[in-house]
Curated annotation (Swiss-Prot):
Descriptive protein name: Segregation and condensation protein A
Main location: cytoplasm
One of the record's GO cellular component terms: cytoplasm
NCBIfam families attached to this UniProt entry: PRK00104.1-1 (NF000992), PRK00104.1-4 (NF000995)
Record key words, sorted: Cell cycle, Cell division, Chromosome partition, Cytoplasm
GO biological process terms held by the UniProt record: cell division; chromosome segregation; DNA replication
Family under the similarity heading: Belongs to the ScpA family.
Cell compartments where the protein resides: Cytoplasm
Entry keyword annotation includes Cell division: yes
PANTHER family given in the database record: SEGREGATION AND CONDENSATION PROTEIN A
Amino acid sequence: MQYNFKVEAFEGPLDLLLHLIHRYEIDIYNIPVADITEQYLSYVHTMKELQLDVASEYLVMAATLLQIKSKMLLPKHEEDVLDNGDDFIDDPRQELMERLIEYKKYKQVATELKEREQERAQLYTRPPIDFTSLQQEEETSLPLDVTLYDMLAAFQKLMRRKKAKKPVTTRITRQEIPIEQRMTDILKQLKIKGGRQSFYDLFVDDEREIMVVTFLAVLELMKNQQIIIEQEHNFDEIFVSSSNKSA
């Protein structure tokens, strides 16, 4: 059964690379190409396995990373030194690094503009604020913004867990469940659990097909703002909560 699922929030390969750099606290000026390539290809493989609409530029970036990786493995010779006599040896990562830095600046500016727009809108639409609890709220650490790439990482971890627990001789009975039905089931499940549940606890079935449908249903509920995804710190467990739009 095919689930061709398009998610607009996947902004492109540079966005994925920046996510990996942030997630693994990598120095953008000294990218470990072998490690970042392995992680990048793992994400792309998972996206394709889920039948997400993977744009061609992701595959182009994959080829670029593999090319840079191969160049980094080549021995350095005297002829690699630039003709101008400088001792600097051309770094195969240089162009990618510059693109990432430029894209990071663009994202920061876009985020700042969006925040200013929201602040201006609140000046005219926001009711009077009660400041009595402001100090207490400031002292509380806010959850991280969970991206779709974080969700992919959580799904990869889940698949590894399930695979490790699954007996080799397990016989799989194929079931086909519509995404819409699974979305309804998840909302009912959250209601029974008091409105909040661990992301991993949504996957009670070990069958790969049902796990894929469940994950796509979670993404669709995220897109519809029917659920809220929370994660306190990087690599922490992800929790799913009902939103006021889920009723």
